[in-house]
Amino acid sequence: MSGDRDDKRYPYPKDDAELRRRLTPMQYEVTQHAATERPFTGEYTDTEDAGIYHCVVCGTALFESGAKYHSGCGWPSYFKPIDAEVIDEKMDYTHGMTRVEVRCNQCGAHLGHVFEDGPRDKTGLRYCINSAALNFEAKPEWK
């Protein structure tokens, strides 16, 4: 993990026992211990359906399908969140790298990382997000 989860207080209260009951082991490890799914294994990596991606822990709407694109990195990629206020960014110096960790701003769940190698005609950002941190709500009427 990139830092102490208690250095910021998030509005959504979390109960560890309840999270362990409700989340899969992978969802728990990703969101609570900043684990990472293996590339190209996540449920939403190739999803192209219209809809909204929510935080698996608290349900906050995080990304819209219109901002999703195929980056080839092996994880779902978005060029922007649904709103800047839903994301918390924190420097991550783990694994001998310097990266920017992305968390849900409501509950502090680890989502993934953001990089500056996204589509230049959009934001230039690539939000590289673990499928295990997300729930997808289909919106077929958006197509």
Curated annotation (Swiss-Prot):
<dbReference type="InterPro" id="IPR002579">
    <property type="entry name" value="Met_Sox_Rdtase_MsrB_dom"/>
</dbReference>
<feature type="binding site">
    <location>
        <position position="107"/>
    </location>
    <ligand>
        <name>Zn(2+)</name>
    </ligand>
</feature>
<dbReference type="InterPro" id="IPR011057">
    <property type="entry name" value="Mss4-like_sf"/>
</dbReference>
<dbReference type="GO" id="GO:0005737">
    <property type="term" value="C:cytoplasm"/>
</dbReference>
<dbReference type="GO" id="GO:0008270">
    <property type="term" value="F:zinc ion binding"/>
</dbReference>
<feature type="active site" description="Nucleophile">
    <location>
        <position position="128"/>
    </location>
</feature>
<feature type="domain" description="MsrB">
    <location>
        <begin position="16"/>
        <end position="139"/>
    </location>
</feature>
<keyword id="KW-0560">Oxidoreductase</keyword>
<dbReference type="GO" id="GO:0033743">
    <property type="term" value="F:peptide-methionine (R)-S-oxide reductase activity"/>
</dbReference>
<feature type="binding site">
    <location>
        <position position="104"/>
    </location>
    <ligand>
        <name>Zn(2+)</name>
    </ligand>
</feature>
<keyword id="KW-0862">Zinc</keyword>
<dbReference type="InterPro" id="IPR028427">
    <property type="entry name" value="Met_Sox_Rdtase_MsrB"/>
</dbReference>
<keyword id="KW-0479">Metal-binding</keyword>
<dbReference type="GO" id="GO:0006979">
    <property type="term" value="P:response to oxidative stress"/>
</dbReference>
<feature type="binding site">
    <location>
        <position position="55"/>
    </location>
    <ligand>
        <name>Zn(2+)</name>
    </ligand>
</feature>
<dbReference type="GO" id="GO:0030091">
    <property type="term" value="P:protein repair"/>
</dbReference>
<feature type="binding site">
    <location>
        <position position="58"/>
    </location>
    <ligand>
        <name>Zn(2+)</name>
    </ligand>
</feature>
<dbReference type="Pfam" id="PF01641">
    <property type="entry name" value="SelR"/>
</dbReference>
<comment type="similarity">
    <text>Belongs to the MsrB Met sulfoxide reductase family.</text>
</comment>
<protein>
    <recommendedName>
        <fullName>Peptide methionine sulfoxide reductase MsrB</fullName>
        <ecNumber>1.8.4.12</ecNumber>
    </recommendedName>
</protein>
